[in-house]
Amino acid sequence: MILSDRDLKYYLEKSWIKIQPLREDTIRENGVDLRVGNEIARFKKTDKIFDPDNPDPSFFQTEKGEEFIIQPYEHVLLTTEEYIELNNDVMAFVNLRSTFARLGLFIPPTIVDAGFKGQVTIEVVGSSFPVKLKRSTRFIHLIFARTLTPVEYPYQGKYQGQKGVTLPKFNSQISSFYYQHQSI
């Protein structure tokens, strides 16, 4: 079941969904808008090979600021201003607000799992021309859905509790939680 604005207000009142800071214009008809945070990570152009078994953070350049220029076809990681917490029976689909999609910006399909807590880090792919993003601009839209029952294993993954832009985490950094709960 997709949550409407009324449902969202009720879930927020009951603390089944938490969003900090929560502004008046955040809650929309069938979802919540989240804002551009104060940090991005740019993917560096290189011929060097990235090895997931031996991750090297030098492939990224992290920046803090009040505004960011996304260059043509550039890939960046962006964080939201808001910190969210989802109950064990609530998940969210992340979409780019249509105004930015109409500029040619793109984000891949992304899900926020039931039980997640943290700021959302999202990949953004640039348009065919530079686009300026300012901190606190409503940028992504979360559509919340309630699961029929609470999930058996709420999200406890490697990005739980993340604050700021979070670079990818691989094998040696992955919690064994997921593997402990797989059927054989």
From Swiss-Prot:
Pfam families reported for this sequence: DCD (PF22769)
One GO molecular-function entry: nucleotide binding
Gene3D superfamilies: 2.70.40.10
Keyword Disulfide bond: no
Domain of life: Archaea
InterPro entries to which the protein is assigned, alphabetical: dCTP_deaminase, dUTPase-like_sf, dUTPase_trimeric
List of catalytic residues: 123 (proton donor/acceptor)
Annotated SUPFAM superfamilies: dUTPase-like
Pathway: Pyrimidine metabolism; dUMP biosynthesis; dUMP from dCTP (dUTP route): step 1/2
Entry's Gene Ontology BP terms: dUMP biosynthetic process; dUTP biosynthetic process
Entry's EC annotation: 3.5.4.13
Residues that, per the record, bind dCTP: 97-102, 113, 155, 162
Keyword presence, Nucleotide-binding: yes
Keywords on record: Hydrolase, Nucleotide metabolism, Nucleotide-binding
Catalytic activity: dCTP + H2O + H(+) = dUTP + NH4(+)
Top-level enzyme category: hydrolase
HAMAP family given in the database record: dCTP_deaminase
Record PANTHER family: DCTP DEAMINASE
Quaternary structure and partners: Homotrimer.
Function: Catalyzes the deamination of dCTP to dUTP.
Membership in a protein family: Belongs to the dCTP deaminase family.
Protein name: dCTP deaminase
Organism: Saccharolobus solfataricus (strain ATCC 35092 / DSM 1617 / JCM 11322 / P2)
